[in-house]
């Protein structure tokens, strides 16, 4: 049975090695994180929190979880942190359970404009259990309009406002969001899943001084294992937040992942991480600017983060063409989208993964030129084949997980 899994593991390893990954929410963890995630800690059940478990034999995982908590607090300047959420969605759900009652009003960014499913989408728990109201981007600039957000907040009086997004390429002014939340007496949640790496590196405003609670994933720009975290400096709500995670929406935490989160936080505390995040930002800007110069429509006319969206007409077709050429990204809706989410107008491009492999600005500009050729060829098979060859030749200079095999 394991031979079948081993075959798939090696197949996936080869796929990752031979593809250019431009999916903004993906990255490559270190081999240390791979090792810890696959460690014996996966065997330990540990409901509860350090020193307050419902199982015996938790003395070791108490230590590892405390290490993760303290390093997370140090990395972000937080007074309190919970490292148990299985994902960013779980973290958001726990916050809602802690601070809201079913039917309460929440205010988040519209999904088509870059919001997340858990920010009030009608197909998600956040839109089913709560009264979800959305704000949009400015139609002309495709950026946040804080005055318009204030007017919506004043009209609907939400109990919770969510800032932080899954597809927004500009910086977020958490101080302005804080002023809005205070005017309507709402809790303020910053979902920093995509920009956590920039905040940790000091390259983006830290939300903690301005918001009630922060949620994040650990596997995007933080370059850690798949998981979630919650942080807060609001002492009045931290017990509620702990209860929102356990027993609110989770049972036993994933101790092997929590230990890997600790490794992730320690890696991000290394001064080299700031250099990495600056390169991520430089690479995204160089790529976006190249597309702009070629006459493409880039949403919000650029980027200040690790990602941007390109308007290509039929995002699904373009994503499939590029996949055949070993360039992997995702189709995505654009602001004020008129087409289906299953066949949207745009594609989303991100730079964290390939920056981890060593790509610099010139490499991303070269990749942009390859994407341009495939798009302009309308998916011509000869062009796709030529592009795939160019990709494989390029990746020879950027090996991934040397010596690793299953």
Swiss-Prot record:
Its cofactor is pyridoxal 5'-phosphate. Homodimer. One of its GO terms (molecular function) is pyridoxal phosphate binding. This is Serine hydroxymethyltransferase. The gene is glyA. The modification N6-(pyridoxal phosphate)lysine is found at residue 220. The record marks 219 as: Plays an important role in substrate specificity. Catalyzes the reversible interconversion of serine and glycine with tetrahydrofolate (THF) serving as the one-carbon carrier. This reaction serves as the major source of one-carbon groups required for the biosynthesis of purines, thymidylate, methionine, and other important biomolecules. Also exhibits THF-independent aldolase activity toward beta-hydroxyamino acids, producing glycine and aldehydes, via a retro-aldol mechanism. One of its GO terms (biological process) is tetrahydrofolate metabolic process. InterPro entries: PyrdxlP-dep_Trfase (IPR015424), PyrdxlP-dep_Trfase_major (IPR015421), PyrdxlP-dep_Trfase_small (IPR015422), Ser_HO-MeTrfase (IPR001085), Ser_HO-MeTrfase-like (IPR049943), Ser_HO-MeTrfase_PLP_BS (IPR019798), SHMT-like_dom (IPR039429). PANTHER family: SERINE HYDROXYMETHYLTRANSFERASE, SERINE HYDROXYMETHYLTRANSFERASE 1. The keyword RNA-binding does not apply. It catalyses: (6R)-5,10-methylene-5,6,7,8-tetrahydrofolate + glycine + H2O = (6S)-5,6,7,8-tetrahydrofolate + L-serine. It is an enzyme of class 2 (transferase). It comes from Mycoplasma genitalium (strain ATCC 33530 / DSM 19775 / NCTC 10195 / G37) (Mycoplasmoides genitalium).
